[in-house]
From Swiss-Prot:
Main location: plastid
Name the record gives this protein: Large ribosomal subunit protein uL22c
MF GO annotations: rRNA binding; structural constituent of ribosome
Keyword annotations of the record: Chloroplast, Plastid, Ribonucleoprotein, Ribosomal protein, RNA-binding, rRNA-binding
Keyword Chloroplast applies: yes
NCBIfam families, per the entry: rplV_bact
Family, similarity comment: Belongs to the universal ribosomal protein uL22 family.
Binding partners and assembly: Part of the 50S ribosomal subunit.
Length: 160
């Protein structure tokens, strides 16, 4: 079995909720509305949406932001939901007794929700630095930010 190694990102924080008693389809309907939005905007959307699945997702987003501020020292105003995914969990199966000795199955579906928050202040600082380097007052030694094309180095790969 091949395992993918995740790079440890210094700008990402996540929260994982497992075995939440909700259908994965219903959770995805809510998650699609907040993916890519800022932390504060996502909280406002989740508070105003009339779905039952909003509350556990609200708690997860809030928990991820608490992880960001406590563990990494990020400010909540700079957080953006970079990744939000819903996976299907186990299905709890029960039998409900009915008339004449019969029984009907009840399926209770669960889901696993992952929320990843990213700090965008790191990228804003890099943009400011690049804008500083592009100013005409900077020397040419610091402005060399070219990336050499590794595939056109000659040899076998240039031929068709």
């Amino acid at each position: 079995m091949i395992k993918k190694r995740k790079k440890k990102s210094y700008t990402e924080v996540y929260a994982l909720g497992q075995y939440i008693s909700m259908s994965a389809h219903k959770a995805r309907r809510v998650i699609d509305q907040i993916r890519g939005r800022s932390y504060e905007e996502a909280l406002m959307i989740l508070e105003l949406m009339p779905y039952r699945g909003c509350y556990p997702i609200f708690k997860l987003v809030y928990s991820a932001a608490a992880n960001a501020s406590h563990n990494k020292g990020f400010k909540e105003t700079n957080l953006v939901i970079s990744k939000a995914e819903v996976n299907q969990g186990n299905t709890v199966k029960k039998l409900k007794p009915r008339a004449r000795g019969r029984s009907y199955p009840i399926k209770r579906s669960t889901c696993h929700i992952t929320i990843v928050l990213e700090d965008i202040s790191f990228y804003q600082q890099n943009e400011e630095y690049l804008m500083y380097l592009k100013k005409p007052g900077c020397s040419n030694e610091n402005r060399n930010l070219t990336c050499y094309d590794t595939y056109s180095s000659g040899g076998l790969w240039d031929k068709k």
